[in-house]
A protein has these predicted regions:
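Cap/insert and terminal regions of metallo-dependent hydrolase folds
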Residues: 185-186, 195, 203-302
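Short, solvent-exposed mixed-charge patches
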Residues: 218, 313-314
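Residue-level micro-sites within transmembrane alpha helices that shape
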Residues: 9, 89-90, 220
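Binuclear metal-dependent hydrolase catalytic cores
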Residues: 2, 22-196, 282-311
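Bacterial N-terminal signal peptides
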Residues: 8-21
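N-terminal secretory signal peptides that target proteins for export/translocation
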Residues: 1-7
Length: 314
């Protein structure tokens, strides 16, 4: 009996270790904000959290990113790196909140080391100017005894190629086409044999297709306006000209052939209240003209676990 118990207990222990290791090599993506500059309560500004091993990486840091993190019980100080796709305001306005609130000592903050951030040229300048803007606040906090180390910033301007390798997590930046916002980047994150790609803001782009090949999940932006609005509104035409339409995104998905395609940073253009607002259902229907594979319309706080199986939860 003792031998059987010993064998059985060891077997169960090994099984638990194996299961833990499998789960431990999953990628977990949480869409924190899936919206645009429009201040919608249901779609916060662009931001996504990627959890891979001990790393908690943010792709962009738009409006309300910290609120969504705390809704998922992730301390702001636990974020180990931020990667900016480009420097349009809707992708960066959450940075001061994440940086400084994450430095505070209560459980929602508690960052002990430097705030680490990567992005296109201008990122170092952005952070240097934020340090100037919040110098008084930082001085007050330090006078209250909060260690200065948590307010330090390590900012890097990057170019295309591998930009981060730590704890088995590899982040690769690649250039995309966001018209006048140059350079703009997408990111591919690889971990434990699995991968996720974030398009960033882009028009239909061959470089994105190249770097997305073999990815498990492709998270892509999309923009759409009703044709009758486009005929009338130059502002709507300009916005659409910066982004990828549903039919174009479907073409990208078809050529990349990911295990799952997901929309985030959903830009539904409404420059004139006289026209009916476009909907997410419109976007999905149009995408099906050029893509018939697995597809999800991203929502704030949606989670995607990427392992041997892909599990999506709202």
């Amino acid at each position: 009996m003792r031998s059987w118990c010993t064998f059985g207990c060891k077997g169960i222990w090994l099984l638990l270790v194996l299961c833990w290791n499998i789960q431990g090599h999953e990628l977990k993506v949480t869409l924190l904000g899936t919206g645009s500059p429009i201040p919608l309560i249901e779609r916060f500004g662009p931001s996504s959290l990627v959890e891979a091993g001990p790393e908690k990486l943010l792709i962009d840091c738009g409006r309300g990113a910290t609120v969504r993190l705390w809704q998922r019980h992730v301390p702001l100080g636990a974020v180990t790196g931020v990667f900016l796709t480009h420097l349009h305001s809707d992708h960066v306005v959450g940075i001061p909140d994440l940086w400084l609130t994450g430095w505070l000592p209560p459980p929602f903050g508690h960052r002990a080391g430097a705030f680490q951030i990567w992005g296109p040229i201008g990122t170092k300048e952005l952070m240097a100017n934020l340090k100037k803007a919040f110098a008084t606040d930082i001085r007050f906090r330090m006078a209250d005894g909060i260690p200065r180390e948590g307010a330090a910033v390590l900012a890097q301007d990057l170019t295309q190629g591998p930009v981060f390798e730590r704890n088995g997590v590899k982040v690769t930046a690649f250039e995309v086409d966001h018209a006048t916002a140059k350079p703009a980047f997408g990111y591919r994150i690889d971990y434990g044999g699995h991968s996720v790609v974030f398009s960033g803001d882009t028009r239909l782009n061959e470089n994105l297709i190249h770097f997305s090949k073999g990815a498990d999940v492709l998270i892509h932006e999309v923009a759409w306006a009703r044709p009758e609005l486009l005929k009338k509104s130059e502002a709507a035409r300009i916005i659409i000209g910066l982004h990828t339409t549903p039919e174009e995104a479907g073409t990208v998905f078809t050529r990349v052939n990911p295990r799952l395609a997901v929309y985030s940073h959903v830009v539904l253009v409404t420059t004139d209240p006289a026209f009916t607002e476009p909907t997410s259902a419109d976007v999905l229907k149009l995408t099906r003209k050029t893509y018939d594979g697995p597809l999800e319309m991203g929502e704030d706080l949606m989670t995607i676990r990427i392992g041997d199986k892909i599990d999506v939860r709202r």
